Every structure is written in structure tokens, then in C-alpha cells.
Amino acid sequence: MNVNSVIYYILFLFASTILAADKTSSSVSPTLVWVTGTDANGKLATTQSTYYQSFMSTYTTAETPSSGSIGLGSISGTVGEIRTYSMTTISQGNGGLSKFNQNGLEMKNLSFVKLIGVSFIAFISFILLI
């Protein structure tokens, strides 16, 4: 095997992975996470584990509150009163995706970008074979 064949094979595997990622539509999503703990000898160890996050089905019907209530259960208070909190948590929703979605782009539909990426890989592979 020459060097060009090896490079072509690696690029082919990379392109296949990109195309395969576009076809999945599962509700279970594996994520690699790093977990730190102690091993059997009591020493600190960090290992990589696969975390699976699954989502339960949602229901189309919802409970309707009885007449005269607003459906908040045991929450009570005065309307219009300013509330104070002893702790405030500020976080950015969706990790880094909020800026991406504000620009009118959707993370779910990147088929065109993947097509461009695969085309680029095919072009480079063709150049290497010449």
C-alpha cells in the first residue's frame, strides 16, 4: 500500500462517518463524558464513559384547572408584588447553540454543510490519487 491509498482510505472513512451521522434519527443520544473517582486502590482516576440521554414521550392532553383557580397548585402570593431571592443563577440556555439559532440557522438541518464537506474530501482524495 502506498501513502496515497492510506490517505484515501482515511478520508473515505471520515466521509462515511459524516454521511452516516446525517441518517440517524433516534431519541437516545450517546455522549462521551469524563468521570473522576477513586479506583480499587483508593487512587484518584479519571475515565471516559458513555452517557445515554433519553427523552420520555410527551402527551398531547393536559390537565385543565378547575373554575376559579389558575392551575399553580400550592404556589401562593400576591399579584404584582416584587419578590427577592437569596441566590440568583445566571446561565445560558442550550449551551452555545443560542447564538447559532439567533442567526436563523438550525442545528438540525446541516445537510448542505455536510455535502460541501464530503465534496471537499472527495476533491482532495482525487487530487491525491493523481
Curated annotation (Swiss-Prot):
Record bears the keyword Ribosomal protein: no
Signal as UniProt keyword: yes
GO cellular component: a single term: extracellular region
Q: Which UniProt keywords apply?
A: Cell membrane, Cell wall, Cell wall biogenesis/degradation, Glycoprotein, GPI-anchor, Lipoprotein, Membrane, Secreted, Signal
**A Pfam family of this chain:** KRE1
By its UniProt entry, which InterPro entries does this protein fall under? Kre1
Residues bearing glycans: 109
Q: Where is the signal peptide?
A: 1-20
The record describes its membrane topology as: Lipid-anchor; GPI-anchor
Q: Which residues form a coiled coil?
A: none
Top-level taxonomic group: Eukaryota
Which compartments is it annotated to reside in? Cell membrane; Secreted, Cell wall
Primary site of residence? membrane
GO biological process: any one? fungal-type cell wall organization
Q: Which family does it belong to?
A: Belongs to the KRE1 family.
Q: What does this protein do?
A: Involved in cell wall 1,6-beta-glucan assembly possibly by the addition of linear side chains of 1,6-linked Glc units to a highly branched 1,6- and 1,3-linked glucan backbone.
Q: State the name under which the record lists this protein.
A: Protein KRE1
Source organism per entry reads Candida albicans (strain SC5314 / ATCC MYA-2876) (Yeast)
Q: Which gene encodes it?
A: KRE1
